[in-house]
Swiss-Prot record:
Keywords: Acetylation, Activator, Nucleus, Transcription, Transcription regulation. InterPro entries: Med31_sf (IPR038089), Mediator_Med31 (IPR008831). The keyword Transcription applies. Component of the Mediator complex, a coactivator involved in the regulated transcription of nearly all RNA polymerase II-dependent genes. Mediator functions as a bridge to convey information from gene-specific regulatory proteins to the basal RNA polymerase II transcription machinery. Mediator is recruited to promoters by direct interactions with regulatory proteins and serves as a scaffold for the assembly of a functional preinitiation complex with RNA polymerase II and the general transcription factors. Belongs to the Mediator complex subunit 31 family. Transmembrane segments: none annotated. This is Mediator of RNA polymerase II transcription subunit 31. GO terms for cellular component: core mediator complex; mediator complex; nucleoplasm; nucleus; ubiquitin ligase complex. The modification N-acetylalanine is found at residue 2. It comes from Homo sapiens.
């Protein structure tokens, strides 16, 4: 009986840990949040830097499939470099990253729409030629 309760507690704890780490990793996609962390000295804390290194397991497909903001993995990778962590103290750096993300999404959206239109046209041609 006690073993079953302990397993349930472990499962609940693991589920909570997974959710917290998932949420935190996704927050790393926000350059303003990174600037906030840098200005408060989190990136100077060796334990915090080690935690960021530990979080690299999110790059594995087994975990990455749960991410809504894949750019957080790129930020997590960049945070492994001390120079990048130091630059984030500067609000202009965070603003630049934010602008680059917006440009990427705009380009990605346009490219994706064109691809979807081309696929729809191709399917329509296949349907009309197949009849």
């Amino acid at each position: 009986m006690a073993a079953a309760v302990a397993m349930e507690t472990d499962d609940a704890g693991n589920r909570l840990r997974f959710q917290l780490e998932l949420e935190f990793v996704q927050c790393l996609a926000n350059p303003n949040y990174l600037n906030f962390l840098a200005q408060r000295g989190y990136f100077k804390d060796k334990a915090f830097v080690n935690y960021l290194k530990y979080l690299l397991y999110w790059k594995d497909p087994e975990y990455a499939k749960y991410l809504k903001y894949p750019q957080c993995l790129h930020m997590l990778e960049l945070l492994q470099y001390e120079h990048f962590r130091k630059e984030l103290v500067n609000a202009q750096c965070a603003k630049f990253i934010d602008e680059q993300q917006i440009l990427h999404w705009q380009h990605y959206s346009r490219k994706r729409m064109r691809l979807q239109q081309a696929l729809a046209e191709q399917q329509q041609q296949n349907n009309t030629s197949g009849k």
